Amino acid sequence: SSAVVMACRAVKDEEEIRLTQKAVTIAEKAFRALMNEGARFFIGKTEKQLSAELSYRMQNLGADRQSFPNGIIVGSGPNSAGAHHVPTDRKVRKNEPVLFDFGALVDGYCSDVTRVVFTGRKIDPHLRDIYHLVKEAHSLAIKAIKPRRKASAIDKVARDHIMQGGYKEEFRHGLGHAIGMEVHEAVRFNQTDHTPLKKHMVMTVEPGVYIKGFAGVRLEDDVLVTADGCRSLNKLSCHLEKFILT
């Protein structure tokens, strides 16, 4: 059955890990190059244009294509509050957040990364607080990952932290999912999946807080479960200051 196939696919071999790592590296390299263009490059462009631009850059670096069925997510300003926002013709403005959820497909394996950039130094203090809360939840969840721990227990670590920060309904999806030949594979970091983690599973960790009409923050890495913990396949930091475009 497909459940059996998915269970087998959850644990990756060395070659699968290598290809997933390559997919992460290419995605991040393309995103870094895009950020290096500076705020001026972003301001005035539509979400659709930025989505296409990042997709093109990933392919230019050797990706087969971007890894999502519906394309790269780009949500600017209040649109960053849509957890699965489809890019529109809205033009990016100065001093606002732009959420990018993107990934590359390389030789059949996917990556899935989310970062938020800011098109100027004026960041709403409320948004800054949300960013730091999400970053802490992201980091705590990664520290909690180890073999034999239940997937649901990892979700709880991040969810509890976000709840203590005053947000419950605003974190409106699971913490993450297995990734491999498909972007979303069977094992999920959510409240109902009690699958014990195993060495060499590759999982996303993507806490988020979304305030309708205001903004949203999600930070996502792809992590490899190791013998005694986990290792992030990402090199791109989550430090807010690094994502302020000048």
Regions found by a protein language model. Name each.
Residues S1-T246:
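Active-site neighborhoods and metal-handling regions in enzymes and metal-associated proteins
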